[in-house]
Amino acid sequence: MRQFYQHYFTATAKLCWLRWLSVPQRLTMLEGLMQWDDRNSES
């Protein structure tokens, strides 16, 4: 899981609008995306 977070932050650091988000904001966004993905994969 740690490697996943490293890839996530490396990828998002290159996106200008995500670069300005703090680490907690990016974690919150990631959690929301993962929940959304879980809901979509169940249906």
UniProtKB/Swiss-Prot annotation:
Entirely encoded within the transcript for the small RNA sgrS. One of its GO terms (biological process) is negative regulation of D-glucose import. This is Putative inhibitor of glucose uptake transporter SgrT. Keywords: Phosphotransferase system, Sugar transport, Transport. The keyword Transport applies. Induction: By (toxic) non-metabolizable glucose phosphate analogs under the control of SgrR (at protein level). The keyword Transport applies. Disulfide bonds: none annotated. One of its GO terms (molecular function) is enzyme inhibitor activity. Acts to promote recovery from glucose-phosphate stress due to intracellular accumulation of glucose-6-phosphate caused by disruption of glycolytic flux or in the presence of (toxic) non-metabolizable glucose phosphate analogs. It may do so by inhibiting the transporter activity for glucose uptake (PtsG) as cells that overexpress this protein do not seem to import glucose although they have nearly wild-type levels of PtsG. InterPro entries: SgrT. It comes from Escherichia coli (strain K12).
